């Protein structure tokens, strides 16, 4: 399990050499390879099969996994089987799972045609999450937000198929509010309803109807789930940014999914009180501000809602903070090798989520024939945004000082000792006997590569500004994969698999 996302604002202004590295397709400090983005896309989706909880389907492709968590929810007399383990542990955390579902869906919504033959695989990955979220919200005014005792789970190193730690169930309700996790769940269901609108209209309607009800609950009973369930969800997934950003985020997705005027009015009415003016260069399972601004800006750029012009201004400011040398905006830091970098663990979660916003916004700008305004005469074209996003994807796939891919199973060199229980322990097929809580300690401490490849998993990656990476299980901040690293990466890989050559991008 990852420690909570560290929200540290970048303060370093990147040198001119890094600007060249990021914006020029030819001038990079590593040898750029010809990447098979389609293969990487396929593998990034396959990763989610390794994170599945519940009864696995006949078409399960990662065969070293088996059924697990078949009695989840029984402690509360509800069915909470299914869903995803968030990372390398065996707990189901609803907050990051919902964000994962939202971002997978956003990728399909914006870049669906680019998924090509992998579109159905991606929809299945979304549905594994939304099916679970429907179970977790089946009781009115209640959202079941976690299954498993994180502290007990983290004291063990055992396969999900063997886990014997308490499967404690945690929920938010009117007496124990959790507007943040509930509104994110509503966003996930609303986004999912768009994904399945044509493929399964009946399911799409059920998702949207539930999203509406869950958002109403989130808004009516306000409060952070970190207060209601502090001992259960902290420090793993405390919501440090508060719940106001999730309420705006949920309303934005419900407006996009339903086109109901009430959600537009909600955003308009609550823009100030819920902090929409906060232009923060962060986006992830905890903080939604940058995502809100990009998502709502599409309405402005498409000429559908000029009232929300302030969101576009915020989105432009955010983009300028990612483009070194373009403006005087406070800048995100980049490593010497060109990796977008934030201090703390699991840096790749920032890399993939911020890169996704760069790509999504670049497409909105292209369709509107617009540019990013950075003030004082500075501006950036959509192509510049795409180049930065592509540079980050290429770094992940191997164009970096270590010449290694940070995606398991992609390329000749990739992490072999990832911090992941199921991957690091012998499979049930290879070792049918149960491995108990402490029985996995020897495997955890072993210097041997993991016996089971969690294909497609992207690890946390370099966590300092030196591009260094110790391929070690114990350094979980760098070696642990998460669902919310891969979720935004799917859309990025889909786009670049269909549009790999910057020279062929439309001139902006």
Curated annotation (Swiss-Prot):
Induction notes from the record: By auxin in roots.
Q: Where in the cell is it found?
A: Secreted
GO CC aspect terms: extracellular region
Q: Does the keyword Secreted apply?
A: yes
Q: Where is the signal peptide?
A: 1-33
Q: Which reaction does it catalyse?
A: Endohydrolysis of (1->4)-beta-D-glucosidic linkages in cellulose, lichenin and cereal beta-D-glucans
Matches recorded under PROSITE patterns: GH9_1 (PS60032), GH9_2 (PS00592), GH9_3 (PS00698)
Q: Does the keyword Manganese apply?
A: no
Q: What class of enzyme is it?
A: hydrolase
Q: Which GO terms describe its molecular function?
A: cellulase activity
In which broad location class does this protein mainly occur, judging by the first location in its UniProt entry? secreted
EC number(s) reported in the record? 3.2.1.4
Name the residues annotated as catalytic in the UniProt entry.
Answer: 89, 419, 471, 480
* Key words of the record: Carbohydrate metabolism, Cell wall biogenesis/degradation, Cellulose degradation, Glycosidase, Hydrolase, Polysaccharide degradation, Secreted, Signal
| Cross-referenced Pfam families | Glyco_hydro_9
Give the transmembrane ranges: none
Q: Which GO terms describe its biological process?
A: cell wall organization; cellulose catabolic process
Give the record's family classification. Belongs to the glycosyl hydrolase 9 (cellulase E) family.
Protein name per UniProt: Endoglucanase 6
Protein source organism: Oryza sativa subsp. japonica (Rice)
């Amino acid at each position: 399990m990852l420690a909570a996302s560290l929200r540290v604002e970048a303060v370093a202004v990147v040198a001119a050499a890094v600007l060249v590295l990021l914006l020029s397709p030819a001038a990079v400090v590593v040898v750029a390879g010809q990447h098979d983005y389609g293969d990487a896309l396929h593998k990034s989706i396959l990763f989610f099969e390794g994170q599945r909880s519940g009864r696995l389907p006949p078409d399960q492709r990662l065969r070293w996994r088996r059924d697990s968590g078949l009695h989840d929810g029984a402690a509360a007399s509800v069915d909470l089987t299914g869903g995803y383990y968030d990372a390398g542990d065996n707990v189901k955390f609803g907050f990051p799972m919902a964000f994962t579902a939202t971002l997978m869906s956003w990728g399909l919504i914006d870049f669906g045609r680019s998924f090509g033959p992998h579109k159905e695989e991606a929809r299945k990955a979304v549905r594994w999450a939304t099916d679970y979220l429907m179970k977790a919200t089946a009781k009115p005014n209640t959202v079941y937000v976690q299954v498993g005792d994180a502290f007990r789970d983290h004291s063990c190193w055992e396969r999900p198929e063997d886990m014997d730690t308490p499967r404690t169930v945690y929920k938010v309700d009117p007496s124990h509010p959790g507007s943040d996790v509930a509104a994110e769940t509503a966003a996930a269901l609303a986004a999912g309803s768009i994904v399945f609108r044509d493929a399964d209209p009946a399911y799409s309607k059920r998702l949207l109807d539930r999203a509406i009800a869950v958002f109403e609950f989130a808004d009516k009973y306000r409060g952070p789930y970190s207060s209601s369930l502090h001992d259960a969800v902290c420090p793993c997934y405390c919501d440090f940014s508060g719940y106001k950003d999730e309420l705006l985020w949920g309303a934005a997705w419900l407006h996009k999914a339903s086109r109901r005027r009430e959600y537009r009015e909600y955003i308009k009415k609550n823009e100030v009180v819920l902090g929409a003016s906060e232009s923060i260069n962060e986006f992830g399972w905890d903080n939604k501000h940058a995502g809100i601004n990009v998502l709502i800006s599409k309405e402005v750029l498409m000429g559908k809602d000029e009232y929300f012009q302030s969101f576009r201004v915020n989105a432009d400011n955010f983009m300028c903070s990612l483009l070194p040398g373009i403006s005087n905006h406070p800048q995100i830091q980049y490593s010497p090798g060109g990796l977008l970098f934030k201090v703390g663990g699991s840096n790749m979660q920032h890399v993939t989520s911020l890169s996704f916003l760069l790509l999504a916004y670049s497409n909105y700008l292209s369709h509107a024939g617009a540019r990013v305004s950075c003030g004082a005469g500075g501006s950036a074209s959509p192509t510049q945004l795409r180049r930065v996003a592509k540079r980050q994807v290429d770094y992940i796939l191997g164009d970096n000082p270590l010449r290694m891919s940070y995606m398991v199973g992609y390329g000749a060199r990739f992490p072999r000792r990832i911090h992941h229980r199921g991957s690091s322990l012998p499979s049930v097929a290879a070792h049918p006997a149960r491995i108990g809580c402490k029985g996995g300690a020897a495997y955890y401490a072993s210097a041997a590569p993991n016996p089971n490849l969690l294909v497609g998993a992207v690890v946390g990656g370099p966590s300092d500004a030196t591009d260094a990476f110790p391929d070690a299980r114990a350094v979980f901040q760098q070696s642990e994969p998460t669902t919310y690293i891969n979720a935004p990466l799917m859309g990025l890989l889909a786009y670049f698999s269909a549009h790999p050559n910057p020279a062929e991008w439309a001139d902006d």
